[in-house]
Each structure stands twice: as structure tokens, then as C-alpha cells.
Amino acid sequence: MLKSTKLKNTLLVGATAILVSCGGQKEIKMGSYAYDAQFLKDHGIEYTELVSADGNSKVMVIPAWQGRVMTTSASGDEGDSYGWINYRFINEGKVSSQFNPVGGEERFWLGPEG
């Protein structure tokens, strides 16, 4: 009888822990505007957002990077991120005096920089 009660209590605690852990924050989908915004925020990169009145159209600009437009969205935070962000380069935290391929939207290079 004692083993049965102990097993029931263990199962109850385990089930409760699973339910509580599943009820946390909603996962942000990679490739979304919100994912890119969170990634840059987590790396201490400050940006400015231009947002339409309905909140769907968004433009993310990083003033410290010559006002570079990093990404845009036509469907708010959950919408697709139309820019390209070089996650690996930003994660490494390296800065070059010549060229920093951090990404962005609508950038086109014709020759070497520097």
C-alpha cells in the first residue's frame, strides 16, 4: 500500500512538473522578425524600429551600423524576416577594421571594402 501511494505521488509530481514546464513562454520561430529582434537584443545590439499603425509592417534599423536596415516584416513579429543576419559572425563577436559581414537587407557590394 505504501509503495502504491509513493508511486502515485511520484507520478503526480512528475506530471505536474511537465505541465508547468510546458506552460512557459511561447517559442519564437527561427526565420521570424521576432527571432531576429531577440537575437540582436541578446547580443546587446541596439536597434530602432519603424512600425506601421496596425503593427504589421516593421523595419529594423541599427544606427551604430551606419543606419543599416537589418530586416523587415509585413506580418508583424510572427511574420517572416526578409533580411539576412549572419548569426555565426555576430555570435563570434569579432570586429574587423575593414569588413564586418553582419548582414542586412538589400545590400549589394560591387567591389572590396576598405
Language-model features, listed with the residues they occupy:
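Residues embedded in well-ordered secondary-structure elements
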Residues: L11-V13, F39
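Hydrophobic h-region of N-terminal signal peptides that target proteins for export
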Residues: A15-G23
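Surface-exposed acidic/polar loop and edge beta-strand patches at domain peripheries
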Residues: G23-G114
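Enrichment for repetitive, rod-forming helical segments
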Residues: V13-A15, G114
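Bacterial N-terminal signal peptides that target proteins for export
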Residues: L2-L11
